[in-house]
A protein has these predicted regions:
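Sec-dependent bacterial lipoprotein signal peptides
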Residues: 1-18
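Structural motif
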Residues: 48, 77-79, 142
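N-terminal post-signal-peptidase region of extra-cytosolic proteins
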Residues: 53-66
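Mid-length scaffold segments of soluble, non-membrane domains
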Residues: 67-114
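Helix-rich interaction surfaces within compact, conserved domain-sized segments
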Residues: 106-169
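Bacterial Sec signal peptide processing site at the extreme N-terminus
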Residues: 16-34
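A short, Trp-centered hydrophobic/proline-enriched beta-strand micro-motif
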Residues: 41-56
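Short, surface-exposed charged micro-motifs
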Residues: 41, 68-70, 134
Length: 169
């Protein structure tokens, strides 16, 4: 019994110590959230930001976790590097580039219909298709993206705004 008690006591103390050391105060959390909200607002107003995608939701089938995909808005250009799963109607032979392209933004609008987030509509034309990117970004940096194309099925993504990208600084 003594052999079991000491390791168990050490484990309980270690877990409780980690919880105490890592918790932030209410004031620290409020300051962090305000800083994140200000960084989101600044990125959207200047039109220079990156959204790292972590999950995709095809119109048919189940959602899939993804990594190393993103969209980036910089200097009036949308740099889209997104996976696509779904039906396509008119595409070049071989499938084309789908949602992987760099294209000038035709229309960019930002609205704030909610107190904790923004809606961004980005319209682009590529040589293959026309795309409407509807992006909802919350004050904490989480984002939801819905892509509608003329020649492909609608697809949705979720991700997070990259505040600390070295390329944006």
């Amino acid at each position: 019994m003594k052999k079991l008690f000491l390791p168990l006591l050490a484990a309980v103390l270690a877990v409780s110590a980690c919880g105490i050391l890592s918790s932030e105060t209410r004031e620290e959390r409020v300051v962090r959230e305000a800083k994140e909200a200000q960084m989101v607002r600044q990125g959207l107003e200047t039109g220079n930001f990156t959204i790292d995608i972590d999950r995709m939701y095809p119109l048919r089938g189940s959602s899939k976790m993804v990594s190393n995909y993103s969209i980036k808005v910089k200097d009036g250009v949308l740099i889209s590097h997104l996976p696509f799963i779904g039906q396509a109607w008119r595409v070049p032979y071989g499938g084309g580039h789908a949602l992987t392209f760099d294209a000038p933004i035709v229309n960019y609008t930002v609205t704030q219909p909610r107190t904790d987030g923004y809606e961004i509509r980005i319209y682009v034309k590529t040589d293959e298709d026309e795309h409407l990117y509807r992006l909802t970004v919350f004050d904490n940096g989480r984002a939801s993206l819905d892509v509608q194309s003329q020649n492909r099925e609608r697809i949705s993504y979720t991700g997070e705004m990259d505040f600390y990208s070295k390329e944006e600084k």
